[in-house]
A protein has these predicted regions:
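Active-site microenvironment of metallo-dependent hydrolases
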Residues: 2-95, 100, 105, 404-510
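Metal-coordinating catalytic core of metallo-dependent amide/deamination hydrolases
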Residues: 65-67, 199, 204-319
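Active-site gating loops and adjacent loop-to-helix segments of metal-dependent hydrolytic enzymes
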Residues: 143-174, 217, 284-305, 325-328, ...
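Alpha-helical scaffold segments that flank or form the walls of functional sites
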Residues: 145-218, 239-248, 492-497, 503
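Histidine/acidic-residue-rich catalytic or RNA/ligand-binding cores of hydrolases
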Residues: 146, 234, 265, 284-294, ...
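Glycine-enriched alpha-helix->loop->beta-strand junction motifs that scaffold or abut catalytic
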Residues: 270-275, 301-304, 323-330, 351-356
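His/Asp/Glu-enriched, well-ordered alpha-helical/loop segment
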Residues: 300-301, 305, 346-441, 457-458
Length: 510
């Protein structure tokens, strides 16, 4: 997998063709100035183009602890319940996590540090877990959040979102849509995403999407996907994107190809040297993606590291193809049940020896938070298995545990995104993508079972602090260095412009 270089696309400054309503011209410096606070670095003589969001992002001059965190290369998270999800390292009722130069250096009780060159964070009455990994998100749709509250995948989503609203996106709309989703993910505890934004209407749209991901600080796999309109240069533009942004492996952003199960697309992904990410399901007789995967397998085109989304209603033979090829699976149970995709393939995956990852899919109908995802997954699997028992069936599969579902949301997500060498567990040597979750709130306390508290009791409000690659992105409940009021303003302006261009009628009062 190729990863991002330090090249930086230009982020559009406005969603309208006339930029006169903006306070500055559409340069990377000005767009980032609109969205991310870099005032301290600018005052020191730097330019915003030279400053990533992590620089000088204190919530206020009085937050001494945060300022110290931003300045130190070593951070000690002290005295929390630590769920490493690494079976060799183990979990701890009380332990410390030492971060050094963006990586996890040590995990154990009573880590001793000396001197002033370390920032200490009190994690008592907190649960420390790896960050959530969302393996399938149409992230550009942030400005369309919940616009399809009662929608189905067909005809509503395909007609209204893909067919009507997506063609009306400018590069600036793609930027703010992606940025708002990425920042929202960080706020909710998602530290990595496989983005499948199908709004690559022009190369400038693709540049804007990448710019937004870079500006957000979120870890991401950019699965370059299709778009709408005469300016689409998909899929051939993937070569330009790879040359421009993905010639280094030591970055937060990696490249993949989002595509249908088509032999030419699989061949292109192999030629470029990136994984392919495909939506697949059987809706017989009109759609048989399982048969397409069989043909791809016979042509030798299924490879380790490729990702298969939904995988609904597949027979055992298709599951065997995916498993034997080294492929990974992403399931979106809440969306699949709500929008009519079909019965989530949770048990099908498990019965065929595949450990699935979880994904939000999109936010135009439901929340993208992982607490909703984990609970929905656990409830669905347990309901179907228990119902089989009530119907008299014997030799039932085991019920999912909270720890297993938490693994789906973290390490299995990292495996699916081909990031498990970097993140997914709190293991020494991995990059520090870490969540600090409040366990002392009255809706969680007293803490009787840590995995159960995370999966069954918590919601995004319990995500207190978020680290990505050792950098603090959320602190004590607030995003770090983000002008949220300005972001909200630009989201609404962009939403209004897209809806107006598309001639789409919203229904605020439902």
């Amino acid at each position: 997998m190729a990863e991002q270089s330090k090249s930086k696309p230009t982020a559009p400054a406005t969603s309208e063709t006339n930029p006169s309503d903006c306070s500055a011209s559409p340069t990377p410096e000005n767009s980032r100035r609109h969205f991310l606070k870099v005032s301290a670095a600018l005052a020191a003589g730097g330019t915003a183009a030279q400053v990533m969001p992590e620089a000088a992002m204190a919530q206020g001059a009085g937050d001494i602890e945060l300022n110290r965190l931003l300045q130190q290369r070593r951070v000690l998270l002290k005295g929390g319940v630590v769920l490493t999800l690494d079976r060799q390292v183990g979990d701890f009722a009380q332990a410390d996590v030492l971060i050094e130069d963006g990586k996890i250096r040590e995990v154990r009780p009573n880590i001793a540090v000396s001197g002033d060159a370390v920032a200490v964070v009190d994690a008592s009455n907190r649960i420390l877990i790896p960050g959530f990994v969302d393996t399938h998100s149409h992230s550009y749709q942030g400005i369309l959040r919940n616009i399809l509250s009662n929608g189905r995948v067909d005809p509503d989503y395909n007609r209204d979102i893909i067919g009507t609203l997506t063609p009306a996106f400018t590069p600036a709309d793609a930027y703010i849509g992606m940025l708002s989703t990425a920042l929202g993910m960080i706020e909710m505890g998602t530290t990595a995403v496989v983005d499948v934004s199908q709004v690559n209407n022009t190369p400038e749209h693709s540049d804007a999407l990448i710019s937004a991901l870079q500006d957000s600080g979120l870890r991401a796999v950019f699965a370059y996907s299709d778009g709408k309109g005469p300016g689409v240069q998909y899929p051939q533009d993937i070569s330009r994107l790879q040359r421009t942004y993905f010639n280094s492996r030591d970055q937060l952003l990696a490249l993949a190809l989002g595509a249908p199960p088509d032999p030419k697309m699989f061949a292109l992904a192999r030629e470029v040297g990136v994984p392919i990410v495909v939506h697949v399901r059987n809706v017989l007789p009109q759609r048989n993606d399982g048969e397409k995967l069989l043909q791809l397998s016979r042509s030798g085109l299924l490879r380790p590291g490729d990702e298969y989304i939904h995988c609904l209603h597949f027979p055992a033979d298709t599951w065997r193809l995916i498993k034997d090829s080294g492929g990974h699976v992403s399931l979106s149970p809440p969306i699949e049940m709500t929008m009519g995709h079909g019965t989530p393939a949770i048990q099908d995956a498990l019965d065929n020896g595949v450990r699935p990852s979880l994904s939000s899919d999109h936010a135009v109908t439901l929340s993208s938070d992982f607490f909703t995802l984990m609970r929905s997954t656990a409830i669905a699997q347990r309901y179907f298995v228990l119902q089989r028992g009530r119907n008299g069936e014997q030799n039932l599969p085991p019920l999912l545990t909270c720890r297993e579902v938490l693994e789906f949301a973290t390490i299995e997500g990292a495996r699916c995104a081909n990031l498990d060498g970097k993140v997914g567990t709190l293991s020494p040597g991995k990059e520090a993508d870490i969540l600090i979750l409040r366990a002392d709130s009255l809706d969680v306390w007293p803490l009787n079972n840590a995995p159960g508290a995370v999966v069954n009791l918590m919601n995004p409000s319990h995500v207190e602090t978020v680290f990505i690659a050792g950098k603090v992105r959320k602190w004590h409940g607030s995003l770090v260095g983000v002008d949220e009021q300005r972001v909200r303003q630009r989201m609404q302006e962009s939403r209004d412009a897209v809806v107006r261009r598309a001639g789409f009628q919203m229904n605020l009062l439902g």
